[in-house]
């Protein structure tokens, strides 16, 4: 569906690499989300038992395929992995990189606990049998985005398969968006996914929102009255320390220097959670141009 020279490049590559197959997406969308429509078409054209996914702006390491496949032990139907932006330059990009580490930690931890909340399509794999058994994207086709997270949640809800997180390596992705408008739209899209959660994931989302609402209310009260509440500051500081410990363990060694920006991210997270979650639930965002 690209309007540039992508298809010409693909044809050139397929001419010299017989294992590479290019597929042109249909103009008519099968699902509301363009990416789900394209992925479904690609999956149908495939013949393998294991499906691996990354994005066009990503660079998987040489051992990526073997590493992902090695995690598909008997009974494992879904393998999620970590992806990080590279290079990361500029203050905003570094804040977004810290946020990316946090999202990765959420995915790794929740999958290990058996209640998956997050994953990324930049580094993902599942069995063809899993895809077929849940009806592909048909149950989530009406939702914009979520070819990764919504599908993972669907597989978890249906049950019958184990999910694991591959920490062995990371896929490098393109640097984050630099235009503030694009960043805002992306974050609203991401926040919108929480509104479609059910069960324990929904209760967690409500808890996170309530916590940030309390922190925001308490901070505004302290600013208004000029009186600092030790209990509130202690709670917020404790949250920062716990997050630092968690993200330090999740981050690749080359990323850990970015955690010096964690405090700034914690501050930005307050309006992000309170405002963007509502805007996302209302559908006030656009898909990638």
Annotate each PLM feature.
Residues 39, 51:
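Short aromatic/hydrophobic "clamp" motif used to bind/position activated sugar donors
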Residues 47-49, 120-134:
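Conserved nucleotide-sugar donor-binding
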Residues 72, 76-104, 129-132, 137-201:
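Catalytic donor/gating beta->alpha subdomain of glycosyltransferases that bind UDP-sugars
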Residues 28-37, 43, 144-145:
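A short, glycine-/small-residue-rich helix N-cap motif at loop->alpha-helix starts
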Residues 4-13, 22, 63:
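Acidic helix N-cap motif at the loop->helix transition within catalytic regions
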Residues 10, 61-72, 79-82:
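A short, amphipathic alpha-helix embedded in the catalytic core of nucleotide-handling enzymes
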Residues 202-204, 208-284:
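Membrane-embedded multi-pass helical conduit in multi-pass membrane proteins
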Residues 1-10, 27, 58:
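A conserved acidic beta->alpha catalytic loop
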